[in-house]
Amino acid sequence: MKRLIGIMAFVSMVLTLNAQVNAADSVMQHVKGNRLSVGGYGEVAFSRNFFSDHVSRYSQPEEHKDDPSHGRFDIPHAVIYLGYNFGKGWSLGTEIEFEHGGAGLAYEKEDEEGGEWEQETEKGGEVELEQFWIQKTFSRAANLRFGHIVVPVGLNNAHHEPLNFFTVYRPEGENTILPSTWHQTGVSFFGRYKKFRYEAQLLAGLNADNFTNTNWIKKGTANPLEFEVANKYGLALRLDNYSVPGLRLGLSGYYGESIGNSYPRNANGVDAEYKGQVIVGAFDFTYNSHNWIVRGQADYGYLGDAEQLKYVYNRTNKKSPYHHSAFVSKNAYAVGIEAGYDVFSQISRLRNENLKFYVFGRYEQYNPYASNTKNTAYDYTEVKRMAFGVNYYPVPEIAIKAEYSNRLLKSQYNNEPSVSIGVTYEGFFL
């Protein structure tokens, strides 16, 4: 991992000075001039996985190394954006998301429950409100946003639209250890000054009852209630620099307490004794110039009192919506880099028609259980992943993606190769 971080730092330093302006952080930031804005983004994906989907494939890898392949069709995200400019600096933004075409209730096989079926409540209703905010703009340097907002910690959350990554699905490392898209209710102050963009957010805290060994804090925002519990608070920060044309460098972080952020308050009876401090630090960059796009990120996280979470009441009571029986790690990390070159840039006719065809490669390494809590190991959580593929843009708003990928696990487990095809769009209609 140290070698990969070094490579990322070297790439970000040697990138050329003559570069195009980088893409905007979010689909909302493309809105200019219109009172009413309507747009969105979405993905349709097909995968063929050449490994076992049996729940015991990690506990009994030898028995499942020759299992047949399995396929999946999916609509990971379909998002409708509605925005309105009221005038005098006041505006409204919303994102309504249909995720996996679901209705908010899902059944899944739980590895830590010995393969039992478990119903997971992600959010009541057929759709999820990913964003809903009222914004007051005082100047380019000072804006306030109130409501349900995206938390821009890590590359994947700050740039989560499907044209901002080459792979068919969102980059796997960050998507494994952090909420994605991370969105919560809170207050945001942000702005731009010279070559910097900055943002600070006050949010409802995460809920440690939802943390797991295979996803770390990813499910910490999941909530089966009709309101967002805010006994504890979180603070998110982000700083981006655009000094070099075509190159964006970003730092982001999060701090908050997570134990006791449940309903009713202190349901676990340990609120005064344990805090469950969550600390996340992340570096990311995007380079877009000379027909190259290069993206990279490194995330590291710390969870205080991690060794206590297995024993708190909400995680041991089988009637609780937060029931989990596995230990949670004190540390987690995700590091990744991808690079793609536009082959059509070398063919004048195709270049003049604004067609693009990127050939890309990606490598990432991640582990949501990087520390063996109470000397309990889950070695299958340590993953190295390689992906190669293409992105074809028939028009700037649509990408047709194809990739081959392989998860490389520790030697006692079976690797997990797959082939995926996807069609994505991102744009505005009004």
PLM feature segments, named:
Residues R72, E99-G102, P179, V229, ...:
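Solvent-exposed loop/turn segments connecting transmembrane beta-strands
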Residues V27-F50, P68-A208, N231-A236, D240-R248, ...:
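Outer membrane beta-barrel
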Residues V31, F51-D53, H64-D67, W117-E122, ...:
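Outer-membrane beta-barrel pore domains
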Residues S180, E226-Y233, E273-Q277:
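Active-site glycine- and acidic-residue-rich loops that bind
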Residues N210, W216-S262:
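Loop-centered beta-sheet repeat module
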Residues L4-V11, T16-Y58:
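N-terminal periplasmic/intermembrane-space "pro-region" immediately following the signal or transit peptide
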Residues G205-L206, T214, Y263, K330:
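Outer-membrane beta-barrel porins/channels
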